Amino acid sequence: MSPNFKLQCHFILIFLTALRGESRYLELREAADYDPFLLFSANLKRELAGEQPYRRALRCLDMLSLQGQFTFTADRPQLHCAAFFISEPEEFITIHYDQVSIDCQGGDFLKVFDGWILKGEKFPSSQDHPLPSAERYIDFCESGLSRRSIRSSQNVAMIFFRVHEPGNGFTLTIKTDPNLFPCNVISQTPNGKFTLVVPHQHRNCSFSIIYPVVIKISDLTLGHVNGLQLKKSSAGCEGIGDFVELLGGTGLDPSKMTPLADLCYPFHGPAQMKVGCDNTVVRMVSSGKHVNRVTFEYRQLEPYELENPNGNSIGEFCLSGL
């Protein structure tokens, strides 16, 4: 795992503690003997493959990218806790309640959120998610064990929880399932290649890269009917139901990011752009009438590239946020 991604993820944990005014709980001694980002290690994933299910304690603030069983036990009142889960792009995440011992009447709660939310910004955005915002929250204190298993709609999910009484807590099992047509994705890595396919579905799909990157779109297929390409319009993307847009910003929510470029028509051959933003998103809007596909590669920008932007580069409005 790259140091920069490690830092980006650590910012999520720091933001959470800053928002709740309890950063004193991030003690140096804990940081010295515990590294939550070890779970992103490819070597560790290979070592665990085919072995016994991975088990460990869950912290009040945590981030996980492995399947396994995780137990939270309060050692003092823990009032503002969250755990972020992320899997491979082509996977759903299932959160299963093995055991829950919390006092809902006393103010405890345990909620699953379908996606990630930070500082009021959601991924996927409300515009891109198949469920209304209210239905993306599943409250254990309302549903109980009637919903023991909850599956995400994409490769990220999270839980919020509050436990007052020391000794109380819960145990979860995290599993993943294949997603044949991943729609909304947060990339685990600063470099990669991905093909986003939307087959005859009226939906919007966003691929989020939480780093400044250079992105190269190599293939775009839009608006085909029986193998015949639709005629181009002279009005740009206005009124076109199928297109791809490139977005940049400093938060999680694609709907609050700045549009950088629109791609309205099919093409083959590289189109490259540098984006010096904390978050870069490739977003496909589909009418449901066609099979749309976009293939792109991305890599994290080097520090010298951020300091000296040139060529086909967009990022001046983002650089102050880096």
From Swiss-Prot:
Disulfide bonds: 60-81, 104-141, 183-205, 237-264, 277-318
Keyword Ribosomal protein: no
Stretch forming the signal peptide: 1-24
InterPro entries linked to this entry: CRF-bd, CRF-BP_C, CRF-BP_N, Sperma_CUB_dom_sf
Glycosylation sites per record: 204
GO CC, alphabetical: axon terminus; dendrite; dense core granule; extracellular region; extracellular space; microtubule; multivesicular body; nucleus
One Pfam family this sequence matches: CRF-BP_C
One Gene Ontology term from the biological process aspect of the record: inflammatory response
Cell compartments where the protein resides: Secreted
PANTHER family per record: CORTICOTROPIN-RELEASING FACTOR-BINDING PROTEIN
Role noted for this protein: Binds CRF and inactivates it. May prevent inappropriate pituitary-adrenal stimulation in pregnancy.
Similarity annotation: Belongs to the CRF-binding protein family.
Protein name: Corticotropin-releasing factor-binding protein
Species annotation: Homo sapiens (Human)
Highest classification ranks of the organism: Eukaryota, Metazoa, Chordata, Craniata, Vertebrata
